[in-house]
A protein has these predicted regions:
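Hydrophobic alpha-helical transmembrane segments
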Residues: 1-65, 105-144, 148-211
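Glycine-rich active-site/cofactor-binding loop and its immediate structural neighborhood
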Residues: 57-92
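Active-site His/Glu-centered metal-binding helix of metallohydrolases
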Residues: 72-80, 93, 97-101, 130-133, ...
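Basic, amphipathic juxtamembrane/active-site segments
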Residues: 79-119
Length: 211
């Protein structure tokens, strides 16, 4: 299935000179991984508390900007690990765990908006965790780590960024709170349905590859 993840090689080529510079400065893959997680969690808390007491503002657009920067962080830590011989068992743990922590925080912060259904957002977090676990499980049966779409990590970053943009621009279009609820929860439901398909694809392709 198509996924934004397939654009990763081209993205890495753009970042390669920057990665070489980081290596010369003594920056390690694990440093980048942990820093990205800390910024993600800090931003999630900031959005959650900031928008509890006021309506949407331009500040919400920090979210899609960070999601793009975070994709660069994820590419950089992987390139440092692979191309500069920094791969380690600790790095493998940090890569998976920090991503899951960051994803969960960055999705849950949308609970602060009253028009978003909490139960639906919690379900998305669960399905996102399950999809990553389905990918991580593949090596246990002799297959490669699976990154199949259509709702991988990069895809979720895009759709949640779109959610943030919708939340920002909607008040300029309409003041119908019921409609914004339908739009945002409909988008979240769409993400959930594609997450279920992603889980299925990762399990199916892991088993088929192993056979």
């Amino acid at each position: 299935m198509p996924s934004i993840y397939q654009l990763k090689p081209a993205f890495q080529n753009l970042l390669r000179p920057f990665v070489r510079g980081l290596f010369r400065m003594g920056v390690t893959a694990n440093m980048v991984t942990v820093l990205a997680m800390l910024i993600s969690v800090a931003l999630a808390f900031f959005i959650y508390f900031h928008f509890q007491n006021q309506t949407t503002s331009l500040i919400i657009l920090i979210y899609p900007l960070w999601m793009l920067i975070r994709m660069a962080f994820n590419a950089v830590d992987g390139m440092l690990a692979r191309e500069f011989h920094q791969q380690s068992n600790l790095g493998a743990y940090l890569n998976e765990l920090c991503d899951v922590i960051s994803d969960t925080a960055l999705y849950l912060c949308f609970i602060t908006f009253a028009f978003i259904q909490t139960e639906l957002l919690l379900l998305i977090c669960f399905l996102a965790l399950l999809s990553e676990y389905a990918g991580v499980m593949a090596p246990l049966i002799g297959s490669d780590r699976r990154y199949d779409g259509p709702m991988g990590k990069s895809d979720r970053a895009f759709w949640f960024s779109l959610l943030a943009v919708i939340i920002y621009i909607y008040p300029f279009i309409s003041n119908n709170n019921q409609m914004i609820s339908y739009i945002t929860n409909g988008l979240i439901l769409f993400i959930g349905l594609l997450l279920i398909l992603t889980i299925y694809n990762r399990i199916k392709n892991s088993v088929n590859t192993h056979i």
